[in-house]
Amino acid sequence: MLGASALAVVQVASTVNDLFQILFFGIGNASAVMIGNELGRRNEDKAYSYAVVFLKMTFAINLVMSVALFLSRGMVINIYDFDQETNIMLANTLAVYAIYMLPKMFTYVLFCGILRSGGDTRFCMLLDLLGVWVIGVPLAFLGVLVFHLPLHIIVAMVFFEEWVKLYF
């Protein structure tokens, strides 16, 4: 069973991860505004070219930020006064966050920035809802209560929904 150490690790990992992902929230919002403006002007070709540019930019920045998050694990661990076991748990969890930043931020820009700006909000909502309630929550339940897996594996299982969303 996971305890206070796991809760601390998830809190720290989520906060650090958010620092690396904030750039993508800006990219997603910028793409929504720029693409939405072009679609409103009935300039679909320019909106499409913006979408392609934003996706390429997201992919390139995503690689850099994922590697930076992975490499910063040691610095993050040094900030906190955790025991050795918790430090290992934090390092492993940050590694999972770094790996899953790739599909997560790509789908964020794709869904929140590009598809929603084009009016495809129902598809985005359904994919988000199904991802969380059909994939993420059941896998977390199985990982914690049935299989008693380590924290980083449970986090990876929950984030698996991002690969599924990327497929659609």
Where are the language model's segments positioned?
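Short helix-kink/termination motifs in transmembrane helices of multi-pass secondary transporters
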Residues: 1-2, 71, 75, 137-138
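Short loop-to-helix capping motifs
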Residues: 3, 83, 120-121
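Short runs within selected transmembrane alpha-helices of multi-pass transporters and secretion channels
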Residues: 25-28, 97-117, 123-132, 139, ...
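Amphipathic, positively biased hydrophobic alpha-helical segments used for protein targeting
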Residues: 14, 37, 58, 124, ...
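Short alpha-helical transmembrane segments in multi-pass integral membrane proteins
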Residues: 35-101, 143-168
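Small-residue-rich hydrophobic transmembrane alpha-helices
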Residues: 7-73, 105-124
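Short extramembrane helix-to-coil loop segments that connect adjacent transmembrane helices in Major
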Residues: 2-6, 147-150
